[in-house]
Amino acid sequence: MGSSGSMVKPISGFLAALIQYPVPVVESRADIDKQIKQIIKTIHSTKAGYPGLELIVFPEYSTQGLNTKKWTTEEFLCTVPGPETDLFAEACKESEVYGVFSLMERNPDGGEPYNTAIIIDPQGEMILKYRKLNPWVPVEPWKAGDLGLPVCDGPGGSKLAVCICHDGMFPEVAREAAYKGANVLIRISGYSTQVSEQWMLTNRSNAWQNLMYTLSVNLAGYDGVFYYFGEGQVCNFDGTTLVQGHRNPWEIVTAEVYPELADQARLGWGLENNIYNLGSRGYVATPGGVKENPYTFVKDLAEGKYKVPWEDEIKVKDGTIYGYPVKKTIHS
């Protein structure tokens, strides 16, 4: 188990740890229970090694793995909140940390399941629940999230939001988090190596475009099919990379994060204060700036009419290429 980054809690701000969790090979419910125990063990051991730790983050699919033949079956799904989250909550309370966890969630309405992330605070309370807005189609069968992009209070003056893997490829997701007040965006991922460069690029651009920190971590290792790149990354609000992990399973990437600095930039910057400037265009020439929306795609998306000019020619619009029958209920 290696480590990169800081070791001590800052006087202001907070110390975060991103766990490059080894991609789980999961064949049964017993394997899931094993991962839960391992995650809990990792919480306690990481806190022991970093006594000032306040936030620990586990990547997407760290609890239930990526067994695509079974991942939507009743045996593999969890209820959120439920027994699994209760165990995570107990561990967070015992170690006095905020924890970010990944769960494939049973749909309470009986439909297709959700890809869900939660944040638990040091009192053992679930303070944020997020369902992935943009499943990685056509590979993933999850239902698109219906909880929006919530924001919660975190350590060291932070306002936290979580996005999941493919979500981070959409600048609109990061902007939504910032627009709702987040100064730290956490991204948990289960990508294979084919998109590692794009993953790092978007972590930086999401930080820069919104003047917020991004804390991102991916699964690491080989599952017999794909290699997962790890590469935990902490980006400053100016888009620069503060800490970058490697491709090692079990590497712990730590960083001191200062949310107040992001807040100060949002209040004090003129040039490149783009999250404000978006809604106040040309405020030198027009006092207060132009407020009207000039963007066709924003209007069309809001009206449920979003359609790219080449949409009728797009070849892949369902999951049949990955064996998902059209209109078949995948929850069993």
Swiss-Prot record:
InterPro entries in UniProt: Aliph_Amidase/BUP, C-N_Hydrolase, C-N_Hydrolase_sf, Formamidase
Listed name of the protein: Formamidase
Domain CN hydrolase residues, every copy: 14-259
Function according to Swiss-Prot or TrEMBL: Is an aliphatic amidase with a restricted substrate specificity, as it only hydrolyzes formamide.
Enzyme Commission number: 3.5.1.49
PANTHER family on file: FORMAMIDASE (PTHR43674:SF15), NITRILASE C965.09-RELATED (PTHR43674)
GO molecular function: formamidase activity; N-carbamoylputrescine amidase activity
Active site: 60 (proton acceptor), 132 (proton donor), 165 (nucleophile)
UniProt entry tagged with the keyword RNA-binding: no
Family statement drawn from the similarity comment of this UniProt entry: Belongs to the carbon-nitrogen hydrolase superfamily. Aliphatic amidase family.
Catalytic activity: formamide + H2O = formate + NH4(+)
Keyword Hydrolase: yes
Chain coiled-coil ranges: none
GO terms, biological process: putrescine biosynthetic process from arginine
Keywords, sorted A to Z: Hydrolase
Gene3D superfamilies given in the database record: Carbon-nitrogen hydrolase (3.60.110.10)
A Pfam family hit: CN_hydrolase
